Regions:
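Core nucleic-acid recognition elements
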Residues: 10, 33-167, 182-188
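A structural-propensity feature for long, helix-poor, extended segments
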Residues: 36-48, 52, 254-293, 486, ...
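A glycine-rich phosphate-binding loop feature that marks nucleotide/adenosyl-phosphate handling sites
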Residues: 41-42, 60-63, 78-84, 190, ...
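Core structural elements
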Residues: 50, 65, 137-152, 191-205, ...
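Active-site cavity-forming subdomains of large catalytic enzyme subunits
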Residues: 85, 89-132, 214-491, 495-501, ...
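Catalytic alpha/beta core of large soluble enzyme barrels
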Residues: 118-124, 130-144, 430-431, 524, ...
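Conserved oxyanion/phosphate-binding beta-strand-loop segments in alpha/beta enzyme cores
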Residues: 128-144, 148, 176-210, 236, ...
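Internal maturation/activation junctions in enzymes
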Residues: 201, 517-539, 564-660, 731-732, ...
C-alpha cells in the first residue's frame, strides 16, 4: 500500500479519488487529452511516503511531457494543475481570498506600497474579480507569471494570485483618476482578459514599494571628462532599478584628437566604452541579470571601424567590450555613397560636433563643407568597404544594430524641441535627447557665486583675457579673488520608454480597437505620473514630453486564425487597416486626455499642433505597398486634425512596437509582429525544458503558421514599412536568414530596402542552419527583458 505525506506532515493511505478530482477538473472540456492517461502515467512514478507536493509535481510533469504538435492542450492541463497547487500555497484552499485580505497580507510583508488601496471600494472591486480567467494561461504562461511577476515573501513563498495581481496593478495605475473604481475596473478587464498587456517592469513593479515602471532609457554623453563620468553614474542608477539603456557616444572625440591643445592625446571612444561595459557588469539589474546597455555611434566618426569590432573575440582586449550592444547611427548620405561606390569621409567630433545636431539636407550641406575644409582632420574609406564590414559583422554576430538617423528625424513629431540622437536597446524608441550642458561655477572668497559658459571669454583684473574654463584661484575678477572654479552640469534630456502592447489575436476589429486602445493610452499616461524615477533628469524629461509607446503583439496568430499568408497582399492590407485604426484611436485618446488633464509641455509648434500626423510624413515607397489613396482611409483624419489643433495632445510620443517575448508568453500568443520560429520548440526554465506549441494550432491554421526562416526577409521589411506609416516612433524588427541563403548581396538588398522604405532601425539578424533539431531550445539570452 502506498502512503502519502500530507502538507501538515500527517501520513495516510493514498486516496486515488482525491487525485481524480483534480485530474478531472484539469482535463475537462479540453480536446485531445485524457484523464485516465494522465492518472496512469503519473501513478507509474508514485512511491511509498510520497508527499502531496511531489504528487502535484508528478502530475504537472506528466502533462508537460505530453505537450506536442498534435496534442497542444496538455499545456492547459499542466497549467490548471499548477494553478491548483498555487491556490493552496497562497490561500490554503482552491480559490481566492477577499481582495482586502490580499492587500493587508502583502502590506504586512512589505511587498505592496501602502496608501493606495484606501482610495478604492474594495468590496466592489473584489466582486468584479474573475478567477475563471486564470484558466486562459497555458503552462509556460503561468510558469512565467509565477517566476517573474507574482509577489513573494522574504522566503520566496508566493503571496499573490493572478487575478489579484491584475487588479492591484489596475488599482495602482488608476489611483489618481477622478473615478478610480471605474477606471481600475476598465484596466483590470483589459489586462485580465489578455486583450493587452503592460511591459515587464510595469507588471512586475506596479503596486510595489519600488514602482519603477519604465522599460528603458536613452541618453547622450558630452565630450568632457565630467560629462562622461556623470553618464556612467546615470547609467549605473538606471541599471540598478532594472532599466535597459541606449546611449549615444557620438560626441566623444576620436582617437588621435586634441586634448587641451595637444594633438594625438585622445585615446578615442573605445576606452570609455570599456568602462561602460564594466558598469553593465558591476551594476546588475537588482541582482537578477547583468545590465543591458546599447551604445550608439554616428557612422562618420573616426572610431567607427574599431566600434564595429567592439565585441570581437580577437584583438586587443583593452579595446573590446563584450557585454555592450553596439549600434550605428546611419545617415542617408552614407548609404547614397555606398550605392555610388564613392569614398566616405570620417571626422573627429571635437572639430565637427554640429554634425550630431543636424540631419537631412542641413547635415549633408555641412558634411560637404567639412570634407572641403583642409584644416579639418579627416580619414577616408571606400563607403562600400565600410558597408561590407558592417554587414559581415552583422551576419557573424548579429551586431551592430542599424538605426537610420534621417528616417528617424524626418518623422520626429517634436523636431522643434530637439533632435533624436539614438534609439534604445531594442531599437523601437525614437525621442529627443540631449547631453548635459556644462558651465563654469566661479566661487569667490566672499562666498558669492557666478556662472560662465565654458568657452566664454573673461577678462581678469590683470587684464588677461581667457576662456572661463581656464580660470583658477590665482585670478581676480572685478576686485573679487576666486576661491575655486569648478565645472557643473545643467541637466540635458534622458528619454524614457513606457510600454504596453495590444494583443492582435484578440483585438482585431474596429469595434474592439476603439474600446481597448483608449484604455491602454490612459493606462500608459498614468504610468508617467506614478512612476519611480531613478534620477531627476529622467523625470523632468518624461514630464516634458509625456512619451508612451503603445505597440502590438500576436500578429502571426491573428494572421493564421484569419488564414492569411505572411507577406501576401492580404497580409499587408490587413495590418494596414489595423494599424490605421490603432493609430487613429491612440491620437484621438491623447487629444481627449489633453482636454481632460492638460497638454504636454512641448506641444506648441510640434507637428501635432499643426495637424501633421505620422501618416502625413509616411515614406512614399511604403505608401505604394498597399496602394491606398489619400481619400481611401477608413478614419476621419481631417476631423481628428482639427480636434488635435483645438485640444492639443497629452503625449508627445505615442506608438512604438517593442519585442514582447515575456508578455507574449504570458498571454499565450505569438511574439510581437514576428512570424513564428517553429511550430514547436522548447523554452528553458528553472524547471528544465518546457515544450511549447504555437497557439491554436489546428487543421485550419497549420498552413498559415510559416517559420520566419521560410519567409523572404524582404517581406518582413515590407510588412514593417506598412506598419511604420502609422507609427510616430519605431519597431523592433529582427531579420531572419537561413545560413545557406545568406550572401553579401542578400544582406545589402535587405538593409538598403529597409532604409528606402522609411524604416527607422533594424534589431538582430538571426541566422539558422538548415538542419532541424526537434529538441531546439529558443535562445532568449540576447533579448532585452525590459521591453518585453
Amino acid at each position: 500500500m502506498i502512503t502519502v505525506v500530507k502538507r501538515n506532515g500527517r501520513i495516510e493511505p493514498l486516496d486515488i479519488t482525491k487525485i481524480q478530482k483534480y485530474t478531472k477538473d484539469a482535463t475537462d472540456n479540453l480536446e485531445g487529452v485524457s484523464q485516465s492517461e494522465l492518472e496512469v502515467d503519473a501513478r507509474l512514478q508514485f512511491r511509498d511516503k510520497i508527499t502531496t507536493e511531489e504528487i502535484q509535481q508528478t502530475l504537472i510533469k506528466t502533462a508537460v511531457d505530453k505537450i506536442d504538435i498534435d496534442t497542444p492542450n496538455w499545456s492547459f492541463v499542466a497549467s490548471r494543475l499548477f494553478l491548483y497547487d498555487l491556490y493552496h500555497k497562497v490561500s490554503g484552499f482552491t480559490g481566492y481570498r477577499h481582495l482586502k485580505e490580499y492587500f493587508e497580507n502583502a502590506e504586512e510583508k512589505g511587498r505592496i506600497l501602502k496608501g493606495f488601496k484606501e482610495k478604492f471600494d474594495l468590496e466592489f472591486l473584489n466582486s468584479q474579480i474573475k478567477p475563471e480567467r486564470d484558466f486562459q494561461f497555458n503552462y509556460l504562461g503561468i510558469k512565467t507569471l509565477y517566476d517573474r511577476y507574482l509577489l513573494k515573501d522574504a522566503n520566496n513563498h508566493p503571496i499573490e494570485l493572478p487575478q489579484h495581481m491584475f487588479m492591484s496593478i489596475a488599482m495602482f495605475l488608476a489611483q489618481n483618476e477622478q473615478e478610480p473604481n471605474k477606471i481600475a475596473l476598465e484596466f483590470y478587464e483589459v489586462l485580465s482578459k489578455f486583450e493587452a498587456m503592460c511591459a515587464t517592469p510595469t507588471l512586475a513593479n506596479a503596486r510595489t514599494t519600488k514602482h519603477q515602471l519604465s522599460s528603458c532609457y536613452i541618453g547622450s554623453t558630452p565630450d568632457n571628462i565630467e560629462g562622461i563620468f556623470d553618464s556612467y553614474k546615470e547609467m549605473a542608477l538606471l541599471s540598478k532599478y532594472g532599466g535597459g539603456i541606449g546611449w549615444d557616444f557620438s560626441l566623444v572625440r576620436s582617437i588621435g584628437s586634441y586634448i587641451d591643445g595637444h594633438k594625438n592625446a585622445s585615446a578615442g571612444t573605445i576606452p570609455f566604452l570599456k568602462i561602460a561595459n564594466d558598469v553593465a557588469i558591476a551594476v546588475d539589474q537588482l541582482g537578477t541579470r547583468k545590465g543591458a546597455i546599447a551604445v550608439y555611434l554616428e557612422i562618420w566618426h573616426i572610431d567607427v571601424m574599431e566600434f564595429i569590432d567592439l565585441r570581437k573575440n580577437s584583438g586587443d582586449e583593452r579595446r573590446r567590450a563584450h557585454d555592450l550592444f553596439p549600434a550605428l547611427w546611419v545617415c542617408d548620405l552614407f548609404l547614397k555613397r555606398v550605392l555610388e561606390d564613392a569614398m566616405w569621409t570620417l571626422f573627429d567630433p571635437y572639430e565637427c560636433k554640429d554634425l550630431t545636431e543636424l540631419y537631412g539636407q542641413d547635415f549633408e550641406k555641412r558634411y560637404l563643407e567639412y570634407e572641403k575644409d583642409p584644416k579639418i582632420i579627416k580619414e577616408y574609406i571606400n563607403a562600400k568597404d565600410l558597408w561590407k564590414k558592417i554587414l559581415m559583422n552583422y551576419f557573424e554576430a548579429g551586431l551592430p544594430f542599424l538605426a537610420f538617423k534621417d528616417n528617424a528625424n524626418r518623422c520626429n513629431p517634436n523636431a522643434h524641441a530637439g533632435i533624436i540622437r539614438s534609439s534604445n536597446l531594442c531599437t523601437e524608441i525614437f525621442q529627443n535627447t540631449a547631453p548635459n550642458h556644462y558651465y563654469m561655477q566661479i566661487e569667490y572668497t566672499d562666498g558669492a557665486i557666478e556662472f560662465f559658459e565654458e568657452k566664454e571669454l573673461v577678462t581678469t583684473d590683470s587684464n588677461i583675457t581667457k576662456c572661463a574654463n581656464k580660470l583658477t584661484s590665482t585670478d581676480i575678477l572685478k576686485g573679487k579673488p576666486i576661491y575655486i572654479a569648478t565645472k557643473v552640469a545643467k541637466d540635458g534630456q534622458t528619454a524614457v520608454c513606457n510600454l504596453a502592447s495590444i494583443n492582435l489575436s484578440k483585438i482585431n476589429t474596429e469595434e474592439d480597437i476603439k474600446r481597448v486602445v483608449p484604455i491602454m493610452v490612459r493606462l500608459l499616461d498614468n504610468v508617467i505620473d506614478l512612476n519611480f524615477y531613478p534620477n531627476r533628469k529622467v523625470k523632468a524629461t518624461n514630464l516634458q514630453n509625456r512619451a508612451i509607446g503603445l505597440g502590438v503583439m500576436g500578429e502571426a496568430q491573428m494572421l493564421a486564425e484569419h488564414q492569411i499568408a505572411w507577406g501576401s497582399k492580404e497580409h499587408l492590407e490587413k495590418i494596414d487597416a489595423l494599424m490605421e485604426q490603432i493609430s487613429y484611436h491612440a491620437i484621438d485618446t491623447s487629444a481627449n486626455l489633453a482636454k481632460e488633464k492638460g497638454v504636454y509641455k512641448d506641444f506648441e509648434n510640434s507637428e501635432w499642433s499643426k495637424g501633421i500626423f505620422p501618416i502625413d510624413k509616411a515614406n512614399n515607397e511604403a505608401l505604394k505597398l498597399t496602394e491606398k489613396g489619400l481619400f481611401n482611409h477608413a478614419c476621419d483624419w481631417q476631423g481628428l486634425r482639427e480636434k488635435v489643433k483645438s485640444n492639443g495632445m497629452r503625449n508627445g510620443y505615442l506608438m512604438a512596437i517593442a519585442p514582447t517575448s515575456s508578455i507574449s508568453i504570458l498571454v499565450g500568443t505569438t511574439q510581437t509582429i514576428e512570424p513564428i520560429y517553429k511550430k514547436k520548440w522548447f523554452e528553458e526554465n528553472l524547471s528544465g525544458l518546457i515544450p511549447v506549441v504555437v497557439p491554436n494550432l489546428n487543421v485550419e491554421t497549420w498552413n498559415f503558421y510559416t517559420s520566419a526562416y521560410d519567409i523572404d526577409a524582404k517581406d518582413l521589411i515590407k510588412a514593417a514599412a506598412v506598419r511604420q506609416k502609422w507609427i510616430d516612433q519605431g519597431q523592433s524588427i529582427n531579420v531572419f536568414l537561413r545560413i545557406e541563403n545568406a550572401s553579401g548581396k542578400t544582406l545589402h538588398d535587405i538593409y538598403t530596402l529597409a532604409w528606402k522604405l522609411g524604416l527607422k532601425s533594424t534589431y538582430y539578424l538571426r541566422s539558422e542552419s538548415p538542419s532541424i533539431d526537434e529538441k531546439s531550445v529558443l535562445d532568449r539570452s540576447v533579448e532585452c527583458f525590459n521591453c518585453q
